A protein has these predicted regions:
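Substrate-binding cleft of secreted/luminal carbohydrate-active enzymes
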Residues: 303-322, 330-331, 337-417
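Aromatic- and glycine-enriched glycan-recognition loops and surfaces
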Residues: 75-94, 121-145, 255-260
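Polysaccharide-binding and catalytic clefts of secreted carbohydrate-active enzymes
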Residues: 145, 173-302, 314-315
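Aromatic-lined carbohydrate-binding/catalytic grooves of carbohydrate-active enzymes
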Residues: 94-130
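Active-site-adjacent "subsite" loops/lids of carbohydrate-active enzymes
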Residues: 53-81, 150-151, 156-212, 360-364
Length: 417
């Protein structure tokens, strides 16, 4: 299928040649506001007030997760468009310029896919089609408002223990469970990161999105290996050793993820060099390395992995273990290549007790300008290029008990944007 943007180019050409296509209804798309290109901001630009124009170019995104999808009315294309417009208008009103939409939470698709079944978050049942293409509508409506849209997917997760949605018969994981290319563990199902077949499916799934939709980016979050348990992939590791492999289990796991990340990056760039590929790992570096088995340092020193990193620095300034300012600095210091640094921020903590923060456990309950100060602080970091907010509900549909606190935080955040 042709991307809307590519269709537009053809339309523009037709207009230039004076062909009748100009009169067609497709011409309406020319009202689209220009989208910003965040990939070209020079390092350190705009860390002062004089750099205000550069600040405006910074990445400012909102995560819209599968937990938010139920708020969208999927009864018809018209109803869906109206509910999407509300979401996007909220993002614009906050001064954001991007939305990161979860399109593959559970080895499924919130768009027309030849590889994955329709997601249960769209119609309530995996494999059931809504009768229109939600992603196509979201991309078009976002671009009309000058918002970029990134497609966020979970590469390995098929289902977690909390998801009761039945796998549809056509879900590729159904057959792959029988061959060890997908693994059932602790009530959850995950694609086997060591499986070449699973890896290829994930890469093909990314390529399909970039080919068929005018998305501005592909986004992975912090879920990679679901466990540290040696039993999880013991069969695959034994096979690797039998074949003469000498890496330790943990290094081998990290290399499995590295292979996937490199392959996804290559597929994205081959399909459309303008599309970015970024990953949002945990803010806790040790967890990334030892529990998720991701080698972030490789991604931030060698080329060919990612375009941006967006660590989830969901910590306040007074967090005993990971104080915000020092954690941002530590992440910035890791970067030795051209990878852009975005900071994942945690409005979901506003007005609540931060249980594991030690001396900072009441910080989010007692302050009204943490997010604003976090953005200001991040701007001092050498590689900082923007932020993302987790998540839409926490900002625009907060629990009644924290509504006033959220409003206060968002008002102060707007002051620094």
């Amino acid at each position: 299928a042709m991307k809307p943007m590519k269709k537009l180019t053809a339309l523009a050409l037709a207009c230039a040649l004076g062909l009748s296509a100009c009169a067609g209804p497709g011409g309406a798309s020319s009202h689209s506001a220009p989208r910003q290109d965040f990939t070209s901001v020079p390092p350190g630009a705009g860390s002062t007030q004089e750099g205000a124009p550069a600040q405006a170019m910074r990445y400012r995104s909102m995560w819209f997760s599968y937990l938010e999808w139920p708020m969208l009315d999927t009864s018809s294309a018209e109803a869906f468009t109206a509910s999407v417009d509300t979401v996007l208008d909220h993002c614009v009103s906050l001064g954001l310029n991007c939305i990161t939409v979860q399109v593959r939470p559970f080895a499924d698709a919130t768009y027309e896919s030849g590889l994955f079944p329709w997601s249960h978050v769209v119609t309530g049942t995996q494999g059931q089609a809504p009768g229109f293409d939600p992603l196509e509508i979201m991309v078009e409506e976002a671009h009309e408002r000058g918002l970029r849209l990134e497609a966020w997917l979970n590469p390995y997760r098929v289902r977690n223990s909390a998801t009761n949605a039945e796998l549809s018969a056509e879900n590729p994981a159904t057959a792959m469970l029988k061959t060890g290319d997908a693994i059932q563990y602790n009530g959850a199902i995950t694609y086997n990161p060591a499986s070449k077949k699973a890896q290829q499916l994930i890469v093909d799934g990314v390529r399909e999105i970039v080919e068929n939709y005018d998305v501005d980016g592909i986004h992975f979050d912090d879920y990679f290996y679901p466990t540290t348990d040696v039993a999880f992939d013991a069969a695959s590791y034994a096979q690797y050793q039998t074949g003469g492999g000498t890496m330790s289990l943990t290094d081998w796991r990290r290399e499995n993820v590295n292979q996937l990340v490199r392959a996804v990056h290559a597929a994205v760039k081959e399909t459309d060099p303008e599309v970015v590929f970024g990953i949002s790992p945990q803010g806790n570096m040790e967890n990334n390395y030892d529990k998720q088995f991701i080698d972030v340092e490789a991604w931030l020193t060698e080329d060919g992995y990612i375009d941006y990193i967006c660590p989830q620095i969901y910590f306040g300034f007074d967090n005993s273990t990971y104080p915000y300012a020092e954690t941002v600095e530590a992440w910035s210091d890791l970067i030795e290549n051209d990878v852009q640094l975005y900071i994942g921020l945690s409005p979901y903590k506003i007005g609540t007790e931060d249980t594991y923060a030690g001396s900072g456990r009441w910080e989010w309950a007692n302050s009204g300008d943490i997010l604003a100060r976090q953005v200001d602080t991040a701007r001092q970091a050498e590689h900082y290029k923007g932020f993302s907010l987790f998540r839409y509900d926490s900002v625009f549909q907060p629990q009644s008990g924290v509504k006033a606190a959220v409003q206060e935080e968002i008002d102060s955040l707007k002051q620094v944007l």
